[in-house]
Amino acid sequence: MNILTDPTKLQGCTDTNANKCVEGDGEGSVQVQLDPDLKIGTAKVFSIYGKGGIGKSTTSSNLSVAFSKLGKRVLQIGCDPKHDSTFTLTKCLIPTVIDVLESVNFHAEELRPEDFVFEGYNGVMCLEAGGPPAGTGCGGYVVGQTVKLLKEHHLLEDTDVVIFDVLGDVVCGGFAAPLQHSDRAMIVTANDFDSIFAANRIVAAITAKAKNYGVRVGGIIANRSDATDQIDKFSERTGVPRVAHFPALDIIRKSRLKKSTLFELDHSPELAKVQEEYMRLATELWEGKQPPCEGKALKDREIFDLLGFD
């Protein structure tokens, strides 16, 4: 992995070889360039972004289960130093890639797949990339090492769906690295200003990465919200569709406290509706019924004006 500020210095980019040149993500950007050979392969890859605490891990885990119930082989990758993305699937905090690499003094050849990939509920395979110590290192490096390990152990060859659950609303080059592997980036947001403001920044990050990679905006997942009027305003202005809606139900909040996905809880009418929504979303994403969109992020002032702030 290379961190570059000058896009003309990318490997393979010369004045006489312009077809290999890659434009920068934006003026003054510091880019994390992953090894171009580290491609995930034939699996459909989705990255889940959104404001910190908005419910990305809950959304990711239940979406993973929904895909698995469609008969798909699913791998969920948590990209957060807290390494708690998959614990409702595995019922525990599993060791991170960084943890296990450190245990063998970063001699990756000494690792076995079972050292860092764990089976969760309904056969969903779970991995926590982890992250560098606070204030040091780069999350993009961790993502790169994780994909490298998976490829070296041929763990992506039998995978249909990969879901990256990504730290907060950070859109730096490091934590935007999963976008370089993704087909679609989904944005989780609530019906409030802070969540939508973060969503707008994420749209900008996805659009920047889309210049050089195959990732596209997949849509907005409304979460923890009974109403969606503010989200729908934002959706109309940016061209990013709302593709699912999960209301603010106490049963969803409690599912995480119970270390369970929503598909494991006792039946109730309101729970059944949420399960059906996850199954509908997974089906549409798998079948490509939600076409990619060319979302256009708003300027900060436009967000304030749009949502009624003076």
Swiss-Prot record:
Residues annotated for [4Fe-4S] cluster binding in this entry: 138, 172
Domain of life (superkingdom): Bacteria
InterPro entries, sorted: NifH/chlL_CS, NifH/frxC, P-loop_NTPase, Protochlorophyllide_ATP-bd
Residues annotated to bind Mg(2+): 57
UniProt enzyme class: oxidoreductase
Cofactor(s) required for function per UniProt: [4Fe-4S] cluster
Keywords annotated in UniProt: 4Fe-4S, ATP-binding, Bacteriochlorophyll biosynthesis, Chlorophyll biosynthesis, Iron, Iron-sulfur, Magnesium, Metal-binding, Nucleotide-binding, Oxidoreductase, Photosynthesis
One of the GO BP terms on file: photosynthesis, dark reaction
Protein EC: 1.3.7.7
Gene3D superfamilies attached to this UniProt entry: P-loop containing nucleotide triphosphate hydrolases
Residues binding ATP, per UniProt: 53-58, 82, 223-224, 247-249
Keyword Iron-sulfur in annotation: yes
Pathway note: Porphyrin-containing compound metabolism; bacteriochlorophyll biosynthesis (light-independent)
A GO MF label: 4 iron, 4 sulfur cluster binding
Subunit (UniProt): Homodimer. Protochlorophyllide reductase is composed of three subunits; BchL, BchN and BchB.
Family: Belongs to the NifH/BchL/ChlL family.
HAMAP family assigned: ChlL_BchL
Name of the featured protein: Light-independent protochlorophyllide reductase iron-sulfur ATP-binding protein
Annotated source species: Rhodopseudomonas palustris (strain BisA53)
Gene, per the UniProt record: bchL
